[in-house]
Amino acid sequence: MSLSEEQVQHFLDQNPDFTDQYFGKTLSPEHVAGACGDGQPTDCASFRELCQVEESAALFELVQDMQESVNMERVVFKILRRLCTILRADRCSLFMYRQRNGVAELATRLFSVQPGSALEDCLVPPDSEIVFPLDIGVVGHVAQTKKMVNVQDVTECPHFSPFADELTGYETRNILATPIMNGKDVVAVIMALNKLDGPCFTSEDEDVFLKYLNFGTLNLKIYHLSYLHNCETRRGQVLLWSANKVFEELTDIERQFHKAFYTVRAYLNCDRYSVGLLDMTKEKEFFDVWPVLMGEAQPYSGPRTPDGREIVFYKVIDYILHGKEDIKVIPSPPADHWALASGLPTYVAESGFICNIMNTAADEMFTFQEGPLDDSGWVIKNVLSMPIVNKKEEIVGVATFYNRKDGKPFDEQDEVLMESLTQFLGWSVLNTDTYDKMNKLENRKDIAQDMVLYHVRCDKDEIQLILPTRERLGKEPADCEEDELGILLKEVLPGPSKFDIYEFHFSDLECTELELVKCGIQMYYELGVVRKFQIPQEVLVRFLFSVSKGYRRITYHNWRHGFNVAQTMFTLLTTGKLKSYYTDLEAFAMVTAGLCHDIDHRGTNNLYQMKSQNPLAKLHGSSILERHHLEFGKFLLSEETLNIYQNLNRRQHEHVIHLMDIAIIATDLALYFKKRTMFQKIVDESKNYEDRKSWVEYLSLETTRKEIVMAMMMTACDLSAITKPWEVQSKVALLVAAEFWEQGDLERTVLDQQPIPMMDRNKAAELPKLQVGFIDFVCTFVYKEFSRFHEEILPMFDRLQNNRKEWKALADEYEAKLKALEEEKQQQEDRTTAKKAGTEICNGGPAPKSSTCCIL
C-alpha cells in the first residue's frame, strides 16, 4: 500500500519527535556526501547546525589535539581553522597580550588563518609582528573592555583602525572578536573577519565562537601559566645564584659581574648583554676646570645623571652568549663603541627609565648599528636596557640585554627578571671604589715592572760589548746564525783558565763587571748545556747581561757577589765532583739559581724589611728577600728575549723552576740551622758505602737527599767569601761590614733603634772578634761536613781555618791593645789620685799613713 506525498507530510507534521529522530539518523553529513556522487565529502559548514554526533566528534578531535600537542600555536591554529569553517569567516587571527616599558600592547602571533592554510604560513615571526597599542583598533578595544565585540560594519565603528588593512592590502568589512582571560588578566584576543555567507556575524555565530573558544582559552591559559611558572623559576634561580656570587666576591667588581653573569646566563634568555659602569666622580680636576673658568672652553652641557653627575662610562663589560661564550672588558670605552653609540645607555643613565625596544631597525629615537657587530654575523634586533641603582639611589651603571633567544621581543616578565638581577648588581657596585683602587695599583705594578725591565734588559748596544756582530759580521745578533754566534763567542770569551773559574780560590777583584758576565757565559759552555738544551746564544748573552744589571750598585750584595756564588756552585759541581749526583739539567738550574740568588738586593736584611714595614714584608711572610730575588729571577726568565729555558719541554721547565725555588730560598740563613742535621746524616750515610760508585748511584735516585745537598751547597756558595785566600777575604769582609754598618745607620736614624754590635759603626774595631764568632757558629760546620763528604772540597775548609787564625790574631791583638789601654787608663787614674793626695798634704792636710814607719 502506497502513501501519497500529502499523507507522508501530514504524518511527519503530526509526529515531530519521530521526524527529528529519523532525519538526525539518516541525513548525517556522510550520507549526504555519499549521495552527492562525486566522492567529495560535504563541508560541515554547509549545514546550519551540526548534528550532536558530529559536534561531539569535532570537540573530541580538539581535545585530542590539545592532549597530543604541547605547542600552543599548533593547537590554537587548528581551532581557528575549524572556526573559519564553522562560522563561514574569511579568516581568523590570534593576538597575544604583553607589556613593555609598562605599556600594554597586542602582537600578532597567528595571522590570516583560513581553512586551507598551513601553520608555517600563518605563524608570525618576531621580526614581522604587527603590534597594536590598546588605544588603537578593535582588537585593542576588546583587550581594554575585556568583552566580546561583534562589529557588523567597520565603517560605522569608531574603534576600527585601517592600520592592518593598509599594511596587508586586505579589506575588512565585519569583525567578531573576543578576549581570552586568565582570571582578570587578558592573555590574548582572537578575531574572525568577514562573514562569507551573510552580511555580518550573527548571535548564533557568537555562541558557536564562544563554545569553541572555551578549548582555545584552556590551551592559552595552560600556556600562559606555564610561561609565568617558567619566568618565576628563572627569576628565583637568578636571585639565588646572583646573590651567591655577588657576596662571594666583594672587592673585585669584574669578578663579581663575571661570576654572577656567567652563573645565571642560562636564565637570562638573551644572546648578549653588556654592563656600562658610570664614573662616580662629582668634582672635576683643576686642570679641567681652568679652561672653563678662563672662558676658553664651554662648560659641560651634555646629559647628567639624576644626582647631577656627568655621564661618563669608565668601563663596559660585554658578555657574549651566542656562538662561543666570551667576556670582554673595555676600560674607558670611546663614545662610538657599539654598546654606547646608540645613545640608549646614556638615556637610561640620564632618566633612570627601563627601555624595552622591540625592533631596533625601526626605532626612531636611538640609532643602533644595522650590520653585523663581528665576524659571527650577529645583529642587534631587540634591546632591554635598565639602570643599576645602589642603596643611595645613585645610578652606578646601565645593564643592556640584546636579542631574546626565541627571537621575540623582551616582555614584562623579562623586565622583572632583569631588574631583579640589576638590584643585586647595584649593591655589589658599592665596592667600585675599592675595585678601582686595586685596579690602579695593579696597573701601577705593571707599569713599574715594564720600567724595571726597560732599565734592566740588555739593549741592542750593550749586547755589542760581548757579541760585536756589527763590527765583525755587519749585522744584528738576531740576523746571525747560531754557528756564527758560536764562533764569535769563542773568540770573545776568556776561556776557563784565564780567570781560574774552576778554582776555589777564584777572585773577582781583578775582573771588570763585563768580564764577569763573560765568565758567566763561559760556565754554561763548560757545563755543556748550551748545545744540549738548545739555548739561543743571543738569549744567553742577554740573560747574563740583564742579570748583572738587575743587581743594585750597593757595597757588597751586588753583581760581583752574585757571580761569586754562581762560580762557587760551578766549582763545587766540577772540581768538587758533586756533579756526579746531578743531571746536566739540574746543574743548569743550580748555576742559574746562583746567578739570581741575590738579584735586586737592597743592602738590608729580612729583619730590617719587617721593622721598616717594607711592602716586601707584607707581600712575603717568610724569607722575604729570598722570595723577592726568586720572583725577580722568574720575572726576567718570563721575558722571551731573556728566557734561557725556552726550549725545554714542560716537564723539564717545571723541574728547573722547582730547583730554583729550593736553591734560592735555601740561602736564607734562618733555614740553614734547620737543614744542618739532615745534611750531616747524609754525610754520615755516605761513609757506610765502601764503593763510591754505589753511593753515587744511590744518591742520584734519592730526590729529597739531593735537594738537601743542593740547599746546603747554596749556603756554602753564599758564604764562600770566607774561604778565599786571606788577602781576598780580608777585603771582602770589610765590604760586608761596611754594608752592615750602613744598615745600622738606617736603624739608628730612620727607625730610631740601637743596632746590634755587628751593624754598629761605633763598634767597628770589634770586627775581627765578630768574624771569629761567625766562622765558629755558622761557617765551620758547612765546610767541615763538605770536606768529609768530598775530599776535593777540603781546600775550602783549610782556607777557612787559615782565615780564622788571621782573624783570631787580629782579635787577640785588638784585645791586647784594649787591655793595654785599660791598664794605661787605670794607671792614669791612679796617678791622678796620688797627685791629688800630695796636693792635700802640702795644703796642711793629714799625711798619708805608712806601713813601715811612723812620723813623730
From Swiss-Prot:
Its EC number is 3.1.4.35. A divalent metal cation 2 binds at D598. Binds 2 divalent metal cations per subunit. Site 1 may preferentially bind zinc ions, while site 2 has a preference for magnesium and/or manganese ions. It comes from the Eukaryota. The active site is at H557. Residues 854-856 form a propeptide. Its cofactor is a divalent metal cation. A lipid is attached at C853 (S-geranylgeranyl cysteine). Residues 481-814 form the PDEase domain. It is an enzyme of class 3 (hydrolase). It is found in: Membrane; Cell projection, Cilium, Photoreceptor outer segment. It is a lipid-anchor. The keyword Metal-binding applies. Gene3D superfamilies: 3'5'-cyclic nucleotide phosphodiesterase, catalytic domain (1.10.1300.10), 3.30.450.40. A divalent metal cation 1 binds at H561, H597, D598, D718. The keyword Metal-binding applies. SUPFAM superfamilies: GAF domain-like, HD-domain/PDEase-like. Residues 823-833 have a biased composition (Basic and acidic residues). It is linked to Irish setter dogs affected with rod/cone dysplasia (RCD1) contain a nonsense mutation in the gene that gives rise to a protein of 807 AA lacking 49 AA in the C-terminal. Rod-specific cGMP phosphodiesterase that catalyzes the hydrolysis of 3',5'-cyclic GMP. Necessary for the formation of a functional phosphodiesterase holoenzyme. Involved in retinal circadian rhythm photoentrainment via modulation of UVA and orange light-induced phase-shift of the retina clock. May participate in processes of transmission and amplification of the visual signal. Belongs to the cyclic nucleotide phosphodiesterase family. This is Rod cGMP-specific 3',5'-cyclic phosphodiesterase subunit beta. It comes from Canis lupus familiaris.
